């Protein structure tokens, strides 16, 4: 992989982590259980996407 490709993947990982943190904050502010659950699900999905990209990056390096 080129340095540019690695940098791009790392940027995506950071973006997914940021989105996960934003969803966690939204879940804390949610006023009903359904909204809270949806934000927690989105948080987990974003965190999983970041984990998957990290694993891919480590396997390709």
Protein language model regions, located:
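Conserved catalytic/binding loops enriched for acidic/polar residues
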Residues: 4
């Amino acid at each position: 992989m080129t340095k540019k490709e690695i940098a791009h993947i790392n940027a995506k990982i950071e973006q997914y982590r940021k989105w996960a943190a934003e969803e966690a904050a939204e879940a804390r502010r949610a006023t009903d259980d359904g909204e809270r659950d949806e934000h927690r699900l989105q948080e987990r999905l974003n965190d999983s996407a970041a984990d998957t990209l990290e694993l891919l990056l480590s396997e390709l390096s």
